[in-house]
Amino acid sequence: EGERVLPAIRGMLNSKEQLEQTAAAIRGLDCGTVRIGTFTSVAVHWLPGMIKRFQSEYPKVELKLMNGDYHDVEQWLSDGSSDLGFVALPTKQRGRVTALLEDRLLAVVPVDHRLASLPRFPIKEVENEPFISLLETSDHDARRTLEAAGVKPNIRYTTKDDYAIIAMVEQGLGVSIMPELLLSGRSDNVRIMELTPPASRTIGLCLPDADRAGPATARFAQCVSDWVRERYSRIQNTTS
């Protein structure tokens, strides 16, 4: 019985928050609460910079981060627990979805691995190596890539923790495939290799009800798009 009324209660709370944000905007007060669904790589490498910029312009807006895996974020968006969320494309989630970045998938292998000296890691070799995987509900990127290549991984270990995978590879327990964003800026004792054939994921931002989003939510969504565009245009200009 309680589960049946929960969506209605969440809907009323969301409408109340949107009304409060709109009233605050009319008064010239940029306040309210924005609930952000996110996964690890974005939470670690993107959101701190995005939040810093957003709070410098809208210091009265409260931001609540909800960290999980792809499945968690889509569930939060569906049931109204999050106002907006980062998703991997393509997504079944309804609403306004904006593609932000194509993020390469890379092989993570022990430094003394027999294939570590190659210029690229052949995806088919995953069949011959102990493979360390995220849980099935979390590992859409690697599983999609392997299925597309017709490769059946020799899954030896599974975990929900991205960084636990890196630590296990470091100890020589197996190999894995992970997004470049997640691996950036780390100094682990592992070898990061491009895949052959190459593979990637696309990170997007979803507003499940963009037409009814409160002003603070809409402004944060715009901040996200601007931040990603400026950050990666600077990187391209630096490397070109």
Regions found by a protein language model. Give the residues of each.
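Short, well-ordered beta-strand segments
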Residues: 33-37, 85, 108, 132, ...
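Hydrophobic hinge/microswitch elements
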Residues: 69-74, 78-82, 88, 137-193
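Hydrophobic residues within well-ordered alpha-helices
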Residues: 2, 36, 77-78, 126, ...
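Flexible hinge/capping segments at coil-to-helix
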Residues: 27, 94-105, 109-131
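Beta-alpha-beta core module
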Residues: 93-104, 118, 163-212
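Central regulatory/effector-binding core of bacterial HTH transcription factors
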Residues: 29-93, 152, 159
